[in-house]
């Protein structure tokens, strides 16, 4: 179904936004410039850091050179493939590998590219959503917050060293 040039996926994506949650309007309208009143109500793309866009572009370049640019818009993608890739890139970054040793592309940029491909494929109606059946994980996370507080109280007098990447290699 199409409506005003949008696919059902676009309409559903907009409907999925949380009701009543709008970004704060920290803009100021100036009477002297009529464009301010209109422009300040548009999507604030300037909020996306240019550094992130630039680094993510390297991940998209890698993909374009390997598979062809925008290939997912034609061939389609399965969500699980990109979710797996995001998990692998995050695990590598979390464990100290900032960039892929073969390509030099930032793992975090690859995570961003994967997420953007999923969103774009969904927008274009080319996403096969093969995520597992829904589970109440959000409710579980909220419920476990009580356990976090209980554990923090239980161990409040313990002050072990909290190791980070700056502590060196394990032996």
Predicted regions and their residues:
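Intrinsically disordered, low-complexity regulatory regions
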Residues: 3-171
């Amino acid at each position: 179904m199409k409506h005003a040039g949008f696919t059902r996926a676009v309409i559903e994506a907009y409907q999925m936004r949380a009701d009543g949650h709008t970004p704060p309007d920290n803009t100021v309208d100036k009477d002297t410039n009529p464009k301010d009143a209109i422009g300040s109500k548009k999507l604030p793309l300037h909020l996306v850091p240019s550094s992130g866009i630039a680094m993510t572009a390297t991940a998209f370049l890698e993909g374009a050179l390997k598979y062809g640019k925008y290939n997912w818009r034609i061939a389609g993608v399965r969500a699980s493939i990109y979710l797996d890739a995001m998990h692998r890139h995050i695990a590598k970054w979390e464990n100290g590998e900032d960039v892929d040793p073969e390509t030099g592309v930032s793992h975090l940029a690859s995570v961003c590219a994967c997420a953007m491909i999923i969103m774009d494929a969904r927008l274009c109606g080319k996403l096969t959503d093969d995520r597992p059946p829904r589970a109440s994980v959000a409710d579980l996370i909220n419920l476990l917050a009580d356990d976090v507080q209980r554990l923090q109280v239980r161990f409040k007098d313990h002050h072990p060293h909290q190791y980070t990447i700056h502590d060196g290699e394990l032996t």
